[in-house]
């Protein structure tokens, strides 16, 4: 017999489905834009594609699994653990992609003349592969033993049951809060976020310094070159800010769970924190569309070429290679 779904659960599922319906097409559009526009082929946009792939997976995989967990099916412990781990992998991948983007923007303003020889497509691909491999290691650590199996088994055996425990599948029931706080948050989330803040502060400082000094750059026009870098840096810093705003509340709630087990956490706050984490995957394409000219033009061209019912002359015959507005 299928589990009973309350009105509150139905509302939760509806919101999650809405987020997925925005996130998946939006991030597929980002990947599509990079594919069709040669001007979006530098290292920064390769890292943005990696971020978009993670966000597509959130909408297509993590949100359906979150809905399944919310319904609360009875599963074996390790089955539930496998359901819980993908979000850890994808979150870590997003953080490392954001860190790679920050380092890339720093190099663009720190060594503009040597940037293209230092940051090659091959090195960017190696960095992306390294980020995903590291994300798999961090996200699958609970599968290697850092989980709540011993606690669950103790209760399971106390009831006279044998074999692998069968539980109501819930994230906190299988994932250790020590892992989430000490390892995931304090090692793999908070330090990279703080490092990225410092990197962007240095990027803004270097750009302002160069604009004031008007030092020549590879473009031959320092105002145009560094003005463009400033705008892109602001847009990418906004992506970082939205990520932190979306994920920190849930990690703070995890800290409360670990350090104050008797403290009550209102269910509405938990759901809001979950919606923020999933909703973050839908935010980035919107930021790109409104803040980065190359993406905006490419999105419109894709729309005009593939989705308009009435043929209309394209707004740009050729996609721009460079725009000062970028």
Curated annotation (Swiss-Prot):
InterPro entries with a match to the protein in the record: Adeno_A1_rcpt (IPR001068), Adenosn_rcpt (IPR001634), GPCR_Rhodpsn (IPR000276), GPCR_Rhodpsn_7TM (IPR017452)
Tissue: Widely expressed in brain and spinal cord.
Extracellular compartment residues: 1-10, 70-80, 147-176, 260-267
UniProt keyword Lipoprotein, yes or no: yes
Glycosylation (residues): 148, 159
Annotated TM spans: 11-33, 47-69, 81-102, 124-146, 177-201, 236-259, 268-292
SUPFAM superfamilies (alphabetical): Family A G protein-coupled receptor-like
Cytoplasmic side: 34-46, 103-123, 202-235, 293-326
Pfam families, A to Z: 7tm_1
Annotated S-S bridges: 80-169
Lipidation residue positions, type S-palmitoyl cysteine: 309
Subcellular location: Cell membrane
Matches recorded under PROSITE patterns: G_PROTEIN_RECEP_F1_1, G_PROTEIN_RECEP_F1_2
Entry's Gene Ontology cellular component terms: asymmetric synapse; axolemma; basolateral plasma membrane; calyx of Held; cell body; cilium; dendrite; dendritic spine
Keyword entries, A-Z: Cell membrane, Disulfide bond, G-protein coupled receptor, Glycoprotein, Lipoprotein, Membrane, Palmitate, Receptor, Transducer, Transmembrane, Transmembrane helix
Source domain of life: Eukaryota
UniProt membrane topology term: Multi-pass membrane protein
MF terms in GO: G protein-coupled adenosine receptor activity; G protein-coupled receptor binding; G-protein beta/gamma-subunit complex binding; heat shock protein binding; heterotrimeric G-protein binding; protein heterodimerization activity; protein-containing complex binding; purine nucleoside binding
GO biological-process terms attached to the record: adenylate cyclase-inhibiting G protein-coupled receptor signaling pathway; cognition; detection of temperature stimulus involved in sensory perception of pain; excitatory postsynaptic potential; fatty acid homeostasis; G protein-coupled purinergic nucleotide receptor signaling pathway; G protein-coupled receptor signaling pathway; leukocyte migration
Keyword Membrane: yes
The family this protein is said to belong to: Belongs to the G-protein coupled receptor 1 family.
Task of the protein: Receptor for adenosine. The activity of this receptor is mediated by G proteins which inhibit adenylyl cyclase.
Entry protein name: Adenosine receptor A1
Naturally occurring in which organism (per UniProt): Rattus norvegicus
Taxonomic lineage of the native organism: Eukaryota, Metazoa, Chordata, Craniata, Vertebrata
